[in-house]
């Protein structure tokens, strides 16, 4: 079902949209490396869609009671967007949790294009990228003075 293609399903409700959709970078795999802002949104979210094959479940374990949790590992784009749009239509805060930083191999462009098509507001919360975490783990820096 190409839910997001049927604009008439949501256009007349557009004025009722109250919450943003958040794309959250979960960091490089260590649940403690999610940003403070990312964790706050996960805690407040009514609906969480996370890449379960890549994002440790511990990242979303702080969710509030009653939050709807979806593992997108078994979902296609249509299914993810159907959940996102329906939740947003009901005024729910949606957290779409990606591994690393959503803008690096996060495949968020196609999701953002669909949200743009319907005038749904969203925000991207960056995550700690693995290249930065790797430098920290091996105690190296990327820039050296006088080099």
Task: Name each model feature, range by range.
Residues 18-74:
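Glycine-rich, flexible N-terminal cofactor/catalytic loop recognition
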Residues 19-21, 89-94:
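A contiguous loop/helix-start segment that scaffolds small-molecule binding in enzyme catalytic cores
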Residues 73-85:
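Glycine-rich, highly charged phosphate/nucleotide-binding loops
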